[in-house]
Regions:
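Bacterial Sec-dependent signal peptides at the C-terminal "C-region" and cleavage site
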Residues: 20-29
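N-terminal secretory signal peptides that target proteins for export/translocation
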Residues: 1-6
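Acidic/histidine-rich alpha-helical segments that form the ligand environment
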Residues: 101-146
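Bacterial N-terminal signal peptides
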Residues: 9-20
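N-terminal beta-strand motif that seeds the catalytic metal site of vicinal oxygen chelate
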Residues: 28-40
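Carbohydrate-interacting regions of secretory-pathway proteins
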Residues: 26, 41-45, 101-102, 109-111
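Short, contiguous alpha-helical
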Residues: 37-48, 58-97, 130-171
Length: 171
């Protein structure tokens, strides 16, 4: 009687295992490169939306005198995006802070930010999946750092009585 129960249990486990195996057939394994690219694209688009939306006459706004202005934060974020593209291509690069004074106002910053994002997007698309599986750097660090500054920029928006683009009702 006991051996019948053991066989029944083993048969049940076997059937469950077979069902689980069948359920996973045809599914693609997770793609870290795709996840990273999607996240980087999202955070870059949020930053670009802010750069395009924030009033030009407020680009020099600072929450307090000792912090970066809106324009300086945008150039700082652009520095990270440019760094990610270069490091992602395997270039021997150090974080080289771009000089905010090199960009004269909103149009120049928005144009340079678009260029940095496009360069980074091209690098991400050209990067083989095996590279992402081995290490998500430099993109993961830049995504995290950019997200911190996104939060800072939300505060700049709110201090100016403006609702950030991502917080506005969808049309």
């Amino acid at each position: 009687m006991r051996s019948v129960h053991v066989r029944l249990i083993l048969a049940s486990v076997f059937v469950v295992a077979l069902c689980a195996l069948a359920a996973t057939q045809g599914r693609q394994p997770p793609d870290p490169g795709k996840a990273l690219t999607t996240t980087m694209t999202t955070v870059n688009q949020q930053i670009l939306d802010m750069a395009e939306d924030f009033p030009a006459d407020k680009y020099n706004f600072k929450a307090t005198p000792e912090v970066r202005s809106f324009a300086e934060v945008m150039v700082h974020v652009m520095s990270g995006t440019a760094y990610a593209a270069k490091a992602g291509r395997g270039e021997n690069v150090q974080w080289s802070e771009l000089d905010p004074k090199a960009y004269s106002g909103k149009p120049a910053i928005v144009a340079a930010l678009k260029k940095a994002i496009a360069d980074n997007d091209s690098t991400l698309k050209a990067t083989p999946a095996t590279r992402f599986a081995a290490s998500p750097e430099p993109w993961l660090a830049v995504i995290e750092h950019t997200a911190e500054h996104y939060g800072q920029l939300v505060v700049y928006y709110r201090l100016n009585g403006i609702v950030p683009p991502a917080s506005r009702p969808k049309k």
